[in-house]
């Protein structure tokens, strides 16, 4: 046996069948391209193929069969195996593609099984301390699995998503100005839908009121901001599953970029920011504008509120802290290279000294109620800042600290490949989404990226939401929802 026969991974029978298939394909190919236009050339080619068959086909019966099947005098004879080789080739390509898909699906399923096994192990170690029988500490350690539990489709790109604080309902706002409510256990048809604005909704926030006055009934409030320069306030009527508009807030002179609603005692306020460079504070009960101030020289893109303080991020690449009742600007953060898309306070949580940034470092910060904030930017980074303490005086509004009025960047997260659109903090994890079509989970303690979801959306990921971990009125659940330019919203549940 020669060396080439030893290297060929075929038996003699398989080699013979392959040779016949090659010869038949060559014969068919030249019949199509040469025979009718250049008969003389075809005869010479056919003669060469017949000669080649003498070398390749070992059995005389096979050679005679090949020659007779390619006899030009018999026009009616058709060799059904002439295209056997290209058919097999095409089948192999399809099979290889199918194998790759099956391997990917298998890998995903194996990952899900590992996640479920981990969850079972964690559940076996849980010490129930909450009303739903789940350890609050372990709830905050939850990282969503690779694939969503359900997928919600709407008519246009999703611009904002919010989870109901207590019920399995997600609110979805779109670029066409529509507002939806979906039941997470039956999401094929929305519970309610409303054309709330004439242009795109840019931001949405929700609050379940907690009035101590028995004469006021508690309910969920949904607030939306839009490119139509308006802010709309809705009451979610759970019994009828519908949005009931309470009022509209008018006053901004350009696109309203973001909106926040919060409650302090029995007072409910709404904050909004706009491309008109202003931030406004509204009274929820009567719709009056209580305060207007201009913290930035360009478009104010994002705000967050904690008590009497507002943090704002702007197109001018800075973020600023303002005491909203007085309008006093207290401190500024510089370090981003491009506009800031999102800002948030990092709230303190009790009994978690092991989590970085969630516990005050000094008693002064503890008494003040805040110390850190986070910002996401178009420069593809996320930064955590330490906020300098202002000068606090009894019975007076705080003023800037004359010796320290600049934020200090203490940690930078790098990994996204495009604009970072939204962020959310839960326990020791920071979740972010970006225009690179990915969602990432970061560890606050180490700054490392722990997990990446790369194929949730086919376009930009515009927004995400998780249950907050600092509000006792919010049921501690393990849920995350994302919204994207592809008109889809992914929901993760444990």
Swiss-Prot record:
CDD domains: WD40 (cd00200). Keywords: Cell cycle, Cell division, Coiled coil, Cytoplasm, Cytoskeleton, Microtubule, Mitosis, Repeat, Transport, WD repeat. WD repeats lie at residues 153-192, 196-244, 251-292, 295-334, 347-395, 415-454, 457-492. It comes from the Eukaryota. GO terms for biological process: cell division; establishment of mitotic spindle orientation; microtubule sliding. Residues 14-46 form the LisH domain. GO terms for molecular function: dynein complex binding. It holds the Pfam family WD40. Residues 90-123 form a coiled coil. Its main location: cytoplasm. It is found in: Cytoplasm, Cytoskeleton; Cytoplasm, Cytoskeleton, Spindle pole. The keyword Repeat applies. PROSITE patterns: WD_REPEATS_1 (PS00678), WD_REPEATS_2 (PS50082), WD_REPEATS_REGION (PS50294). GO terms for cellular component: cytoplasm; microtubule; microtubule associated complex; spindle pole. Dimerization mediated by the LisH domain may be required to activate dynein. Self-associates. Interacts with NDL1 and dynein. Positively regulates the activity of the minus-end directed microtubule motor protein dynein. Plays a central role in positioning the mitotic spindle at the bud neck during cell division. Targets cytoplasmic dynein to microtubule plus ends, thereby promoting dynein-mediated microtubule sliding along the bud cortex and consequently the movement of the mitotic spindle to the bud neck. Belongs to the WD repeat LIS1/nudF family. This is Nuclear distribution protein PAC1. The lineage of its organism: Eukaryota, Fungi, Dikarya, Ascomycota, Saccharomycotina. The gene is PAC1.
